Amino acid sequence: MSHPVENVVAAENTEKRPTNFIRQIIDEDLASGKHTGVQTRFPPEPNGYLHIGHAKSICLNFGIAEDYQGLCNLRFDDTNPVKEDVEYVDSIKQDVEWLGFKWEGEPRYASDYFDQLYGYAIELIEKGLAYVDELSPEEMREYRGTLTEPGKNSPYRDRSIEENLALFEKMKNGEIAEGKACLRAKIDMASPFIVMRDPVIYRIKFATHHQTGDKWCIYPMYDFTHCISDAIERITHSLCTLEFQDNRRLYDWVLENISIARPLPHQYEFSRLNLESTLTSKRKLLQLVNEGIVDGWNDPRMPTISGLRRRGYTPASLREFCRRIGVTKQDNMVEFSALEACIREDLNENAPRAMAVINPLKIVIENFSGKEMLTAPNHPNRDELGVRELPFTRELYIDQADFREEANKQYKRLVLGKEVRLRNAYVIKAERVEKDAEENITTVYCTYDPDTLGKNPADGRKVKGVIQWVSAEDYLPAEFRQYGRLFTVANPGAAEDIHQVLNPDSLVIKQGVVEKSLANAQPEKAYQFEREGYYCADSKDSRPDHLVFNLTVSLKEGF
């Protein structure tokens, strides 16, 4: 299924600094003197692992700060202690650093500002702009109205300032049960924007907070916290995705009605990243983890940054992907192949080459004995990466798919009675086969031409095919995890039941062999396994006595 791609380009953009509507706004603000510098922030909620959509926001906020010699804060929007955890805080820090960015100073937390936020809530109450409401959640939904019908005022809306202050104090002191009261901004229940219909700005939660412990039992809502945190940190340009476009009205209302330093920050919205065949809902990703459908948040099939990292994606490839898709106000579905193209280009340029046989078939070179050490370049275009030794022995492994007893002319591999070249080695000819009781081929007996190392046969005969191989006498066993798309549809988020759109073949595990040079393959180290694909050593399970390689991406699109 085809989808429009959001600003994806094939050719490399040579501009040093990308251009988009946000950067144009910043240029105008600096030129007019509205701001003398740029301060951005990346404000994740620590209730899950960061995913590819967050990478776009990270690259945008930190990238703008870098390009304008400004600063970017890392601020944790930690206003819901029930769903947040230090595990997520640590993983977010790690992901941002891994992508190659450094935040200004120490990480910040919205909870750092809880005292100030409480003070601003008191100020709104004293101005008659906030009140304590005791409607039940069900009643509040009923009073809120719909997109076509205005809401109606709560019977508690016109309480006196003194009563509201006293009730808010009781909320703070833990004297009111959870769910029995909240603090609401007094704006307009008839507003065409539901977000402005007296939104809740504080609620009661008797939960231990990972930063503040049990100091508080009332917690500010996102819309109240976010804008004030931006103002406290002197953020000049607050960048959010389009779903927060209506929230900008509340962002501005809060700041305009409290006594906080000017100039005030301004919020700008851009399109979120919608990636084909990918789920980015934290709730649904958590479901995959909790149900054991995937091997944790960093499963290589997950769209999390840690999952992509474990699969073999590099920081440079993700940054390049984010650069290519650009920043617009239009929501589009980005084809997954655009992401794959970025890592494929990166690894083609940087990954050393090696040989692996994923479905081994033994061949015996009948006119060869002993062992000959051959050499092969680690990269065809980068001499500085050096060479490696390949032991050529009487018994070798080739892939089962690279031999047929009979084949047409389009099959340019080993065929009974015909020749093929072994990569970085000799031309061999298949002479006969040995089969088991079920007629499966177990061994192919061959001869080799000793005069064909690094050159064509002297008599001018044409040998067109080239296949990879590994010594059957000097090799390392390896596990190959061949990852595919986790879902069978382009938009799994729209599915009523994600179980119905899971790809049963999203992970296929094979046991094969690799050349001995990979004995010390380090976690996350990427290789091009010639004719097979780009793989990396698994960071969790691979070790010297049990090598595990993850398929990062195929050699060509569509394979």
From Swiss-Prot:
Annotated positions binding L-glutamine: 77, 222
The record's Pfam families line, in alphabetical order, gives: tRNA-synt_1c (PF00749), tRNA-synt_1c_C (PF03950), tRNA-synt_1c_C2 (PF20974)
Q: What is its main location?
A: cytoplasm
Provide the species name: Pasteurella multocida (strain Pm70)
Query: Which PANTHER family does this entry report, sorted A to Z?
Result: GLUTAMATE--TRNA LIGASE, GLUTAMINE-TRNA LIGASE
* Protein name listed in UniProt: Glutamine--tRNA ligase
Q: Which PROSITE patterns match?
A: AA_TRNA_LIGASE_I
Q: Which GO terms describe its molecular function?
A: ATP binding; glutamine-tRNA ligase activity
Q: Show the CDD domains listed in the entry.
A: GlnRS_core (cd00807)
Annotated motif 'HIGH' region, positions: 44-54
Query: Which UniProt keywords are given for this protein, alphabetically ordered?
Result: Aminoacyl-tRNA synthetase, ATP-binding, Cytoplasm, Ligase, Nucleotide-binding, Protein biosynthesis
Instruction: Report the locations given in the UniProt record.
Output: Cytoplasm
The catalytic activity, as recorded, is: tRNA(Gln) + L-glutamine + ATP = L-glutaminyl-tRNA(Gln) + AMP + diphosphate
Q: Which GO terms describe its biological process?
A: glutaminyl-tRNA aminoacylation; glutamyl-tRNA aminoacylation
Question: Which ranges belong to the motif 'KMSKS' region?
Answer: 279-283
In short, the EC number is 6.1.1.18
The residues listed in the UniProt record as binding ATP, with positions renumbered to this chain, are 45-47, 51-57, 241, 272-273
Which branch of life, at top level? Bacteria
How does the annotation summarize its subunit structure? Answer: Monomer.
- Cellular component GO terms, alphabetical: cytosol
Q: Which InterPro entries match?
A: aa-tRNA-synth_I_CS (IPR001412), Gln-tRNA-synth (IPR004514), Gln/Glu-tRNA_Ligase (IPR050132), Gln_tRNA_ligase_bac (IPR022861), Glu/Gln-tRNA-synth (IPR000924), Glu/Gln-tRNA-synth_Ib_cat-dom (IPR020058), Glu/Gln-tRNA-synth_Ib_codon-bd (IPR020059), Glu_tRNA_lig_a-bdl (IPR020061)
Gene3D superfamilies from the xrefs? Answer: Glutamyl-trna Synthetase, Domain 2, Glutamyl-tRNA Synthetase, Domain 3, HUPs, Ribosomal Protein L25, Chain P
Question: What family does the entry list?
Answer: Belongs to the class-I aminoacyl-tRNA synthetase family.
The top EC class is ligase
